[in-house]
Amino acid sequence: MTEGTATIRTRKFMTNRLLARKQMVCDVLHPGKPTVSKTEIREKLAKMYKVTPDVVFVFGFKTNFGGGKSTGFALIYDTLDLAKKFEPKHRLARHGLYEKKRPTRKQRKERKNRMKKVRGTKKSKVGAAAKK
């Protein structure tokens, strides 16, 4: 999308000192154009607030019926470390900042079969031992 086709307005701005971030509702006006991508919204917000795009997290965008206006939520963290600390893992994964470590198929099967051999509360001990 070319520059200047979408207008971003922020409202309900709040500085959350406890979580070291700025949070706001974003209104994106894009008359006659398709929905604006989240990466473009991130870049424009980063430029507006003079921060790098990697500390800007946008989510929850809904486009109004008939198009032309989308509304969502934006969070701008003070640092990337604080963002990694407070943001949910799925949002970090969308930015490429988190990779879930999944055990191999064989390890999962072995754990499942070990769990079958015990009953009740002992399962948690067997499962915990299998993780380490």
UniProtKB/Swiss-Prot annotation:
The lineage of its organism: Eukaryota, Metazoa, Ecdysozoa, Arthropoda, Hexapoda. The gene is RpS24. This is Small ribosomal subunit protein eS24. One of its GO terms (biological process) is translation. Keywords: Ribonucleoprotein, Ribosomal protein. One of its GO terms (cellular component) is ribosome. One of its GO terms (molecular function) is structural constituent of ribosome. Residues 102-132 have a biased composition (Basic residues). It comes from the Eukaryota. Belongs to the eukaryotic ribosomal protein eS24 family. Residues 92-132 are annotated as: Disordered. Residues 92-101 have a biased composition (Basic and acidic residues).
